[in-house]
Regions:
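The feature represents the first ordered module of a protein
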Residues: 1-27
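Terminal leader/tail segments of proteins
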Residues: 2, 12, 16, 33, ...
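Generic structural "secondary-structure junction" signal
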Residues: 6, 21-22, 43, 52-54, ...
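A short, structured beta-strand/loop element
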Residues: 21-46, 62
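Short, compact, well-ordered microdomains
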Residues: 47-73
Length: 73
């Protein structure tokens, strides 16, 4: 399952969401569908994820990502 949180993280004048998944193959596949380059992948201790511009959040959900709150992370 792929998840996307509510886009509330401001950075460089935009709002960003975190795209995460149960498995790395799922995560990378969704990022590719969204046109996000692999170099944007962040393998952090807090969790592997991609930062997604808020403008792509609805597209991610339409492609099957499950919307979650920041608190659910």
């Amino acid at each position: 399952t792929v998840y996307i949180d509510d886009a509330v993280h401001p950075w460089r004048g935009e709002r960003w969401a975190h795209l995460l998944a149960d498995t790395l193959p799922e995560l990378h596949a969704m990022a590719q569908q969204l046109g996000i380059p692999r170099r944007a992948f962040q393998n952090r201790r807090s969790g592997a994820h991609y930062d997604v511009p808020a403008a792509l959040r609805d597209t991610a959900i339409a492609l099957g990502a499950v919307a979650i709150s920041v608190q659910a992370l």
